[in-house]
Amino acid sequence: MMYSPICLTQDEFHPFIEALLPHVRAIAYTWFNLQARKRKYFKKHEKRMSKDEERAVKDELLSEKPEIKQKWASRLLAKLRKDIRQEYREDFVLTVTGKKHPCCVLSNPDQKGKIRRIDCLRQADKVWRLDLVMVILFKGIPLESTDGERLMKSPHCTNPALCVQPHHITVSVKELDLFLAYYVQEQDSGQSGSPSHNDPAKNPPGYLEDSFVKSGVFNVSELVRVSRTPITQGTGVNFPIGEIPSQPYYHDMNSGVNLQRSLSSPPSSKRPKTISIDENMEPSPTGDFYPSPNSPAAGSRTWHERDQDMSSPTTMKKPEKPLFSSTSPQDSSPRLSTFPQHHHPGIPGVAHSVISTRTPPPPSPLPFPTQAILPPAPSSYFSHPTIRYPPHLNPQDTLKNYVPSYDPSSPQTSQPNSSGQVVGKVPGHFTPVLAPSPHPSAVRPVTLTMTDTKPITTSTEAYTASGTSQASRYVGLNPRDPSFLHQQQLRICDWTMNQNGRHLYPSTSEDTLGITWQSPGTWASLVPFQVSNRTPILPANVQNYGLNIIGEPFLQAETSN
């Protein structure tokens, strides 16, 4: 696929633009520029264009050089790319090009949380809604800038407020539109000498001739032709319309909706972002695509060689399911596994930290983020209502991979967000752990409250909130697989315990408290025990107890199966 260098400059040469450019309809350039010309004429002369002048402008725009149209479309696609969230750009390309089942594509919201409006011709005083632009560009439907209220989202759309998927955007058709469609159809059949025109019963009444006046300058055949023709027509790159799959323009909302989807189609759930989106930041071109044999960006070379790259065995796919699941359906789990210290949406007044690791991905010769994740398989994660852990955690890893070492010589201040602050976008391998403890002079209480009626391998999830220190850490507990028990010793006299209203302390100077959990990097079943004989301090029938750890509890660790 070769494009004229006049059309695509170095800034506009991008896989996103090259993939979508052949699917932009030719009417888009003519329609947007015609509306701008009419608006400019009205502001200058304070009167509307005559039909002859408007028709002359239309003919001029239709006969414009293909390179000019292509350059305008490429600039508009570059602007749309910035307004689409980065994690949805690949899906947008694959769905528009017909290589993937249509799924929701979310855009960056405006300051009010609504869908954005952009100027399509570098005119600050004339803006169009993103969904309107998508319908005009990729469906060729001539809509006015005030037709936003006529747009409706498909029943398959899960986020109607911000979705800009062209296949999910439909135009509501009213009774007047249906009546006009019938009238125009009868007019065309009469002009073409159809036999039905000779039937008086099927001829439109005479009063309809004076009831409608065509205000536009496009006739029906011309409008349909330019709405189906790609904008790259005439540049040596012709794409048959039949090869571009799309949903029908008209959809009867009163008819039954078939919600069944193909079994081979991937789910439409996407991983949300945990960091605020910088709207002015321009991401790297390599941060948008993950090449696959069916993807437009299949290879590290130029876009023209993607046909040769189709046979490459390397497959890069985006994860179709988040690594972690959240209790709230609205608050999906983030990619990064270290949470900031805030209140959990499902449990008021409670925050928690998660320790997780990911194995580094294999090296790839492609200049794209190497975060290949297989499609969803039967889950072997640990069962937890709040936290899910990857199944590839290595049980042979020692605790030093999960618990940071503490250096008293390095001063640290206790800040609210220092314990679990997300550190930017990490596309590849990362090993987030709990942040080091604050300065030794600062008190670091860890409140653990649980209900335990079984041995140390099981416990029931419970939470408590501490309103004293901002450096407090809260840990959620839940039953775990009893395999791979790990024990952690605590410093002498670094703990106190509240058992049914009674405060317990170390009995002797050799009394050292230990805690037990299972699987590296997971918090579960924290039960105090005596290190000397490894017996639980509390009997099995104790209902409630709290454990306060003050200072730096993590000193040494030993593993026992």
Swiss-Prot record:
UniProt GO MF annotations: DNA binding; DNA-binding transcription factor activity, RNA polymerase II-specific; RNA polymerase II cis-regulatory region sequence-specific DNA binding
Region entry Disordered, spans: 189-208, 252-445
Phosphothreonine sites (modified residues): 286
Pro residues bias (residue ranges): 359-368
Chief subcellular location: nucleus
Modified residues (Phosphoserine): 264, 292, 295, 312, 328, 333
Chain positions of motif 9aaTAD: 397-405
DNA-binding region: 1-195
Any single GO CC term annotated in Swiss-Prot or TrEMBL for this entry: nucleus
Assigned keywords, A-Z: Activator, DNA replication, DNA-binding, Methylation, Nucleus, Phosphoprotein, Transcription, Transcription regulation
Complex formation: Binds DNA as a homodimer.
Domain characteristics, as noted in the entry: The 9aaTAD motif is a transactivation domain present in a large number of yeast and animal transcription factors.
Name of the protein this chain belongs to: Nuclear factor 1 B-type
Source organism (scientific name): Mesocricetus auratus (Golden hamster)
Upper classification of the organism: Eukaryota, Metazoa, Chordata, Craniata, Vertebrata
Gene: NFIB
